[in-house]
From Swiss-Prot:
Keyword Secreted attached: no
Subcellular localization: Cytoplasm
SUPFAM superfamilies for the chain: NAD kinase/diacylglycerol kinase-like
Cofactor: a divalent metal cation
Protein name: NAD kinase
Broad class of enzyme this protein falls into: transferase
Species for this entry: Pseudomonas fluorescens (strain ATCC BAA-477 / NRRL B-23932 / Pf-5)
Length: 296
């Protein structure tokens, strides 16, 4: 197992609970004589911290591991910035769900100590890369750990588009939009739209239409190495948008092409040894417990 000596900390802004947890984490890491580096945005709201700071973009170059304090959204943002550095990322949950940030604040010291002592699991989560092209020229690019979404923006009209997989025409659709999700994102927006839950170890991508104008419009699971192409109808009178993990919005014009494929770099997500994906799903999604009151 790797030795972590230089630890980066990213925290969600706007929460006093996050700041309290960051202070606890900082104190704990310094007590173990580790080098702690704060992301510059969280450092600005921690006066007198006395630590080295770094931009998120460069944090992956100076750290052995980065700990994210916040919710899943905070980790999504960190993943897009850190995946290219192949650096392990650990999440402490200060959000509402915690599919990705799975360490509770009350167990911070115990679980982080286990990880630092080499007792942890590593999951490699792949990201998607999206590109919007107009007349063969790229007008927007973005990465996503969860999903790439084509949606109508402020318009209430449906979008008409064609779907191609690996150069082969699949279908045309008229829908409120389209979600292209990773296994990580299968428990996010795609799940709300009726998509399947995919285990994070699967090498697959799910395509989920949003309120399609046909009963046969159903989610499709394809090979993770597939290249997807979505062509917006030239007859559209609205300008739909493409978003990556709810960020990096690009406005499309009729006739634009959106290409989505797997990104070469992956996120190295760290979990404590007792991490159980099905327990996380059962807890977060309200699945039933064992029959007969047997607990977990």
């Amino acid at each position: 197992m790797e030795q972590f000596r230089n630890i980066g900390i990213i925290g969600r802004l706007g929460s006093s609970q996050v700041l309290d947890t960051v202070r606890r984490l900082k104190k704990f890491l310094l007590a173990r004589h580790l080098h702690v580096i704060l992301e510059d945005t969280i450092a600005e709201v921690l006066p007198g911290h006395g630590l080295q700071t770094s931009s998120r973009k460069l944090l992956g170059e100076v750290c052995d591991m980065v700990i994210v304090v916040g919710g899943d959204g905070s980790l999504l943002g960190a993943a897009r910035a850190l995946a290219r550095h192949n650096i392990p990322v650990l999440g402490i949950n200060r959000g509402s769900l915690g599919f990705l940030t799975d360490i509770r604040p009350d167990e911070l010291e115990v679980k982080v100590a286990e990880v630092l002592d080499g007792h942890y699991l590593v999951e490699n989560r792949f990201l998607l890369q999206a590109e919007v092209r107009r007349h063969a020229e790229a007008i927007g690019q973005g990465d996503a750990l969860n999903d790439v979404v084509l949606h109508p923006g402020k318009s209430t009209r449906m979008i008409e588009f064609e779907i191609y997989i690996d150069g082969q025409f699949v279908c045309s659709q008229k829908a409120d939009g389209l979600i292209v999700a990773t296994p990580t994102g299968s428990t996010a927006y795609a799940l709300s739209a009726g998509g399947p839950i995919m285990h994070p170890k699967l090498d697959a991508i799910v395509i989920v239409p949003m309120y399609p104008h046909t009963l046969s419009g159903r989610p499709i699971v394809v090979d993770g190495n597939s290249e997807l192409k979505i062509v917006v109808s030239k007859d559209m009178q609205i300008y739909p948008q493409v978003s990556c993990d709810g960020q990096n919005h690009f406005t499309c014009a009729p006739g634009d092409t959106i290409t989505v494929s797997k990104k070469a770099q992956k996120l190295r997500l760290i979990h404590p040894l007792d991490h159980n994906y099905y327990e996380v799903c059962r807890t977060k999604l309200g699945w039933g417990s064992r029959l007969g009151g047997g607990g977990d």
